[in-house]
């Protein structure tokens, strides 16, 4: 807690953004806001408790969802969901995750599975490209490309008639 309070007092910082798995967010959200955190990125790969547990190995979906709702109530400037879609694991949840983001006025970014760790693991068997995600999104939502630019391999789209932006972070297929 004191680390965040100390960082929040640094006047040279334009903004403080935190990326988290969300498991402790319900109890820490107000302290983080008070410390000056303005934006939060929360990992959420599934809305199904068993799939969530499988993907995170120990994660409790309800704790993360409660944390997200507490963060909304606390009033952070921006809350974004980060999601990795994987074939035959959670790829069928694409629309559910986007609809969740729309319902709660959140942004959502899809991050391609990155080739890290065990090099013997065949990521091609589970990896869902952001090109495929974009095609699927266009089947259901009206998207317009934004002029948001980052230093990384990301594209951002606004979903028409919503407050939600979708990010496609493609470190694998577009790098």
Which positions does each model-derived feature cover?
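Radical SAM/AdoMet-radical enzyme domain recognition
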Residues: 1-111
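Functionally engaged cysteine thiol sites
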Residues: 17, 115, 175
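Generic structural motif
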Residues: 47, 88, 113, 162, ...
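Electropositive, surface-exposed helix/loop patches at the edges of structured domains
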Residues: 64, 83, 116-118, 151
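Aromatic-anchored, glycine/proline-accented short structural segments
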Residues: 98-128, 132
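Accessory C-terminal segments flanking Radical SAM cores
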Residues: 118-175
């Amino acid at each position: 807690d004191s680390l965040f309070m100390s960082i929040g007092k640094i006047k040279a910082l334009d903004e403080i953004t935190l990326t988290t798995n969300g498991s402790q967010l319900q109890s820490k959200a107000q302290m983080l806001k008070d410390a000056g955190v303005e934006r939060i990125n929360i990992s959420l790969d599934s809305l199904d408790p068993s799939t969530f547990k499988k993907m995170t190995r120990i994660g409790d979906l309800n704790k993360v969802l409660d944390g997200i709702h507490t963060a909304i109530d606390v009033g952070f400037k921006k809350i974004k969901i980060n999601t990795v879609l994987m074939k035959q694991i959670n790829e069928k949840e694409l629309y559910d995750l986007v609809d969740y983001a729309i319902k709660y006025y959140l942004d959502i970014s899809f991050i391609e599975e990155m080739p890290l760790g065990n090099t013997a693991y065949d990521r091609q068997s589970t990896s869902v490209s952001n090109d495929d995600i974009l095609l699927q999104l266009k089947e259901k939502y009206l998207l317009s490309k934004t002029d948001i630019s980052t230093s990384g391999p990301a594209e951002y789209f606004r979903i028409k008639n919503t407050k939600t932006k979708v990010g496609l972070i493609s470190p694998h297929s577009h790098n």
